[in-house]
Amino acid sequence: MLHIPAVKTCIGNVTSDALAEKLGTKVEIQEINLGFLNRIILDGITIYDQQQQKLLTSSRASIKVNILSLLQGKVSISSAQLFGATANTYRQTAHSKPNYQFVLDSLASKEPQKESRLDVTIGSLIIRNGTLIYHQKDAPKTIGQLNLKHLHITNLSAHILVNTLTNDSLNLQIKRLALDEASGMHLNALTTKLQANKKEARLSYLNIDMPGTCIRIKDGIAHYQFENKQLALPTLTYNLTLSPSYIRPCDFAFLLPALRPFVKKIDVSTGISGTSSSLRVHHLHLSGSSIYLSANGTMRNWQNNLQWKGHINTLSLRANGIQFMVDNLGQQFHIPLEITRLGNIYFKGDLDGHHENIALKGNLHTDAGNAKLAVNLQSNRFKGHIETTGIALGRITNNAQFGNFKAQLDADGYWQGNTLGVKAKGVIDLFDYNQYTYHNISLNAAIEKKNRQMNFDGKFDMNDPNGEIHLNGSFSNMGKLFNAKLQANVAHFNPQSLQLSKQIPTAFFGMQIDANIKGHNLNTALGSIRVKDFDMQAPNKHYHLNALTLQAGTEEGVHTIRLDSDFGQMRLKGNYDYATLSNSITNIIATKLPTSRAATLQENKNK
């Protein structure tokens, strides 16, 4: 009887009218045929939105209906299949309703007492070769990166089973979901099985397959309670296992285009548990061609008072992998080039954080040297301790003048804009500079740097076989005037051995210096420099100076210089340039002493 043309026409009219009435819009169906086992096949379906734009088109749809309900003038759909469907959805702005909202509103029961002619309970949905387009028309478009405000999904295929769907339970199985998105996303297959009620939810499995990615999640379970029809978040607990899987980063270039060159896979597995406000990572393992990570950690109070801790059992990075990451991600994530010069990296330690505070403590081993680190970062402040048995500073800085560096240092400081302030204290056991190894240097100072200007206030001590230096004081060029207050004691100082000068070979110097000067430049400097017990020892020479005092000032607006020393005294008053002062004095003396004049002229001629 169902194949009688009059009956088919009646069924078609009932179905079309029921859909139009339920959705409240124009619905077109080109042809309706009956299939096997109560199936109705609809060809050429078009559903319009309320602006009379095509919302959904499908070359063919197959639905399974309840014949008994149909004979009573109702349409009850238990399963559906869509072939070649295209959904064109959009909204004008983020605050306007989408053009499909009326469909959702029509399916929602606003008047429970009113009986609908259409009962849609789709237990099985199959989609083949579908397309989904969505645009938020006021939002800018992007190319090559996923944009949830502009979606263009093609090759959409799905097989979804809704075994149970009631007010208090759900039994859902996605046997397969595959799609492509214009951003470059390719989902080969997603399968999952989920059961849920008002007390617990169980995720039997979730499998995701992409061209080079295979993710396997299992044994997910969550327990919770409802109060006044609302989920009581404090009652939520959950756990989940990510079985051994692998990820090819370039598969996720639709999220971060910089991942496109990363074609080698990374093996990953983890196990987590938690509550509505906490997360515990029982284990996390990552393994790739240039990286290995074994770690665990916790997070809690992430809603308003985030705290986290992590323990890194092993972090290993190969040099070629680091170089590859810097080449492809360096600019986006501001990775310094110095990282690439460390070579292979191995780290073991702990990290924890609270709000903007981050702390790191552990042992770092690299091809450029090893170090023990303890670092705290708080907003724009930092505090840390470093112990190193030897770091190739020249290799890291790419500066041939530097070599190895061995030290124990504490630092406390801040940065704000282009200003850096540091208080440093510690011992530098050795420091290679200009092909010489300095030993036994201690530092206790406060340093502030802004662009090319700097303040220094503190102590510097060096007890090296070729020089003993004790420096205490301050200097600054950050104000309008250069200012320096320094006291220095120097003993057995050998410039040649330190690779600083070769003018006086094998000479050793000693002296005491007390300086207090300020000025815009050398010619306007005011203050004094005192040198005591200056001593020079050389194989064939010995020179000693008890004292030398140089004072610069002004008298009635005129610059004055006063020099007092063992070998004589000098007073200068007037305008002069330090760069030419020595030659000027020599020429004055030469005019009074002819022999000196001849010697000076001969010297200038030789030059």
Where in this protein do the model-derived segments appear?
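N-terminal type II signal-anchor transmembrane helix
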Residues: 1-23, 86
